[in-house]
UniProtKB/Swiss-Prot annotation:
The lineage of its organism: Bacteria, Pseudomonadati, Pseudomonadota, Gammaproteobacteria, Enterobacterales. [4Fe-4S] cluster binds at C3, C11, C14, C87. GO terms for biological process: rRNA base methylation. SUPFAM superfamilies: S-adenosyl-L-methionine-dependent methyltransferases. Pfam families: tRNA_U5-meth_tr. This is 23S rRNA (uracil(747)-C(5))-methyltransferase RlmC. Belongs to the class I-like SAM-binding methyltransferase superfamily. RNA M5U methyltransferase family. RlmC subfamily. CDD domains: AdoMet_MTases (cd02440). PANTHER family: RNA M5U METHYLTRANSFERASE, TRNA (URACIL(54)-C(5))-METHYLTRANSFERASE. The gene is rlmC. It catalyses: uridine(747) in 23S rRNA + S-adenosyl-L-methionine = 5-methyluridine(747) in 23S rRNA + S-adenosyl-L-homocysteine + H(+). The active site is at C334 (nucleophile).
Amino acid sequence: MQCALFDAGRCRSCQWIEQPVSQQLSAKMTDLQQLLAAHPVAEWCAPVSGPEQGFRNKAKMVVSGSVEKPLLGMLHRDGTPEDLTDCPLYPASFEPVFAALKPFIARAGLTPYNVERKRGELKYLLLTESQLDGGMMLRFILRSEAKLEQLRAALPWLQQQLPQLKVITANIQPVHMAIMEGEREVFFTDQQALAERFNDVPLWIRPHSFFQTNPTVASQLYATARDWVRALNIHHMWDLFCGVGGFGLHCATPQMTLTGIEISPEAIACAKQSAAQLGLTDLHFQALDSAEFATGQGRVPELVLVNPPRRGIGKTLCDYLSQMAPDFIIYSSCNAQTMAKDFGHLPGYRVERVQLFDMFPHTAHYEVLTLLVKS
């Protein structure tokens, strides 16, 4: 992938960009094989990859510069701002949005937040696009509520320019720290969630719910988990750290009892909405801590699917899964190091199948799906 920002030394986020994608994939496979060297793997599936550019459905832009000439991108370590609106990881559909947002910031009088001086209002712009219909969610991350009415008054102009903006919000983040968002969300649109669809499964994206940034590869990840579960003829499963329900909704059948657990109430609201659309009545999504839920249950499911954050599931949950002993565990990981460590705490299971998903081209990161079978 050619990138003018990288060539000019202005951005180094894609550290592997100079390697061909095939070479990147080989290096990732080697890394994964080394991490799992202590665990014999019965079947290595071919890695899955997607487009090498224009694949992101989300932009997280630091707003800097001046109100008349805002920059949308990032801050270097020394505080120097960098405009990244030309980043080739973004689809072409983002270009007109960035182009309209710059004059809009001036029209609305949203002074970019200056980290050094601790002054200004607009900290970040977060943009998410649905693959279903090109609808978008735009979030203004503000330091305070001081400019809310000014922003509200200016929005009709922006909505006229960009009718694809289906959900528009302001998030209030008053803390002078590198925290992306605060708890208070103010909606400027009647619509509060973005409709998405992967493999004919309806999904919903709300402001505070996590959603994968590479939809092409994510849809293949969910479809693979579905195929693995269907082949096992499962009637009762848990989906822990379920997010908006991507895995559980793909795996569920009308004959199956499924419980999905996620700490975020917003994500659970999305999952419930999808389950209702699919007419699946034996799906139960609850906003709880996954480890606390699991350790408090009596009835043992045949399969437990886990999709934890980078820290992994940890020894406590591993020990409980070992004690509970479901027949199968499907582990989806964005950090193979912590996944391998967790496998060390699951001695009663063998690694049946492993597949790498190249969710983050041009970087060392990848996603991996693993099927564990009770020995």
